[in-house]
């Protein structure tokens, strides 16, 4: 199987998000890469499901709370930006201050 760099990156996000969800299910607080992976994965999948950019920008702020992550992580993540594939093409989705 040959994957393009963009496809490899998406696959890495899926794997990282899966690992983060498993750790979260064990009661662990998420670190920076884990939190970004979960948010990124949900945005990519939301685009695939047909949600709009505006819907995803709003949805991205509901995925994780301060209680879900290690101390200091919310302050480290100012924006999460993902190029996602929508039915009408690829678009940039930006979520500002995703962990509240």
Swiss-Prot record:
Q: Name one GO biological process term.
A: urea catabolic process
Give the enzyme's main class according to its UniProt record, as a single word.
Answer: hydrolase
Question: Catalyses which reaction?
Answer: urea + 2 H2O + H(+) = hydrogencarbonate + 2 NH4(+)
* Keywords noted in UniProt: Cytoplasm, Hydrolase
Hydrolase: is it a keyword of this entry?
yes
Which InterPro entries does the annotation name? Urease_gamma, Urease_gamma/gamma-beta_su, Urease_gamma_sf, Urease_subunit
The Gene Ontology terms for molecular function here are: nickel cation binding; urease activity
- The name under which this protein is listed is Urease subunit gamma
Species, as recorded: Paenarthrobacter aurescens (strain TC1)
Recite the lineage of the species.
Answer: Bacteria, Bacillati, Actinomycetota, Actinomycetes, Micrococcales
Q: Which gene encodes it?
A: ureA
């Amino acid at each position: 199987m040959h994957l393009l760099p963009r496809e490899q990156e998406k696959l890495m996000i899926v794997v990282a998000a899966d690992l983060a969800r498993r750790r979260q299910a064990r009661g662990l607080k998420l670190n920076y890469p884990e939190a970004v992976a979960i948010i990124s994965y949900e945005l990519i999948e939301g685009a695939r499901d047909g949600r709009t950019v505006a819907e995803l920008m709003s949805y991205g702020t509901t995925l994780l709370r301060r209680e879900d992550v290690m101390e200091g992580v919310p302050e480290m993540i100012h924006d999460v930006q993902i190029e996602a594939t929508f039915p009408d093409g690829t678009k940039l989705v930006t979520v500002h201050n995703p962990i509240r």
